[in-house]
């Protein structure tokens, strides 16, 4: 029993396409063309000296730092269902639940968000059934010297207010 083989001939790719150099030079030529055009006439370039000047064209749907909302009594709306932590693709939300005395509901005893891991996708906000977590603080920058300063705990999250954009 002989094995039958079939020889397949591939189309030859032209030399210039194989080395990609023409495409690299074309891209660089376009970049330099824009660079020198803007260098010659910089009147149409808008500059924003942040943080002295704040952007004015931010929409209300822009996601800032997180906050935990409260109900009419002043208690946190969060029932520690862990749905926000489950929905988070970066696994940056950590919740420890505790039971409320005289009630079947739970409340978070610890609620921590690692802002260095967070990708600010907003899936935690969409997953929350009680509308307990929001990203509408209007705070878009966070500055710190240590990794611990980027851990937002339950106290920090509950003190943040809804911001003005």
Curated annotation (Swiss-Prot):
Organism superkingdom: Bacteria
Cofactor(s) essential for the protein: [4Fe-4S] cluster
Record keywords: 4Fe-4S, Cell inner membrane, Cell membrane, Iron, Iron-sulfur, Membrane, Metal-binding, NAD, Quinone, Repeat, Translocase, Ubiquinone
A cellular component annotation (GO) from this entry: plasma membrane
Annotated [4Fe-4S] cluster 2 binding sites: 88, 118, 121, 124
EC number, as in UniProt: 7.1.1.-
Transmembrane segments: none
PROSITE patterns: 4FE4S_FER_1, 4FE4S_FER_2
Pfam families reported for this sequence: Fer4_7
Membrane topology: Peripheral membrane protein
Catalytic activity: a quinone + NADH + 5 H(+)(in) = a quinol + NAD(+) + 4 H(+)(out)
Residues in 4Fe-4S ferredoxin-type domain copies: 66-98, 109-138
Binding locations of [4Fe-4S] cluster 1: 78, 81, 84, 128
Cellular compartments annotated: Cell inner membrane
The protein's enzyme class: translocase
Cofactor notes: Binds 2 [4Fe-4S] clusters per subunit.
GO molecular function annotations of the record: 4 iron, 4 sulfur cluster binding; iron ion binding; NADH:ubiquinone reductase (non-electrogenic) activity; quinone binding
UniProt function note: NDH-1 shuttles electrons from NADH, via FMN and iron-sulfur (Fe-S) centers, to quinones in the respiratory chain. The immediate electron acceptor for the enzyme in this species is believed to be ubiquinone. Couples the redox reaction to proton translocation (for every two electrons transferred, four hydrogen ions are translocated across the cytoplasmic membrane), and thus conserves the redox energy in a proton gradient.
Homology family: Belongs to the complex I 23 kDa subunit family.
Assembly, per entry: NDH-1 is composed of 14 different subunits. Subunits NuoA, H, J, K, L, M, N constitute the membrane sector of the complex.
HAMAP family on file: NDH1_NuoI (MF_01351)
Protein name: NADH-quinone oxidoreductase subunit I
Species of the source: Campylobacter fetus subsp. fetus (strain 82-40)
Biological classification of the source: Bacteria, Pseudomonadati, Campylobacterota, Epsilonproteobacteria, Campylobacterales
Gene name, Swiss-Prot/TrEMBL: nuoI
């Amino acid at each position: 029993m002989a094995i039958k083989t079939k020889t397949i001939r591939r189309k030859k790719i032209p030399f210039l396409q194989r080395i990609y150099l023409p495409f690299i030079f074309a891209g660089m030529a376009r970049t330099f063309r824009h660079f020198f055009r803007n260098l010659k006439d910089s009147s149409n370039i808008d500059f924003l000296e942040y943080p002295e000047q704040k952007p004015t064209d931010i929409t209300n749907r822009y996601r800032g730092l997180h906050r935990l909302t409260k109900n009419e009594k002043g208690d946190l709306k969060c029932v520690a269902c862990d749905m926000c932590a489950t929905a988070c693709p970066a696994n940056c939300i950590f919740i420890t639940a505790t039971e409320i005395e005289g009630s079947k509901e739970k409340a978070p005893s610890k609620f921590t968000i690692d802002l260095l891991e967070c990708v600010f996708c907003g899936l935690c906000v969409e997953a929350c059934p009680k509308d307990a977590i929001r990203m509408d603080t209007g705070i878009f920058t966070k500055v710190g010297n240590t990794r611990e300063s980027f851990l937002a705990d339950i106290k920090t999250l509950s003190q943040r207010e809804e911001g003005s954009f």
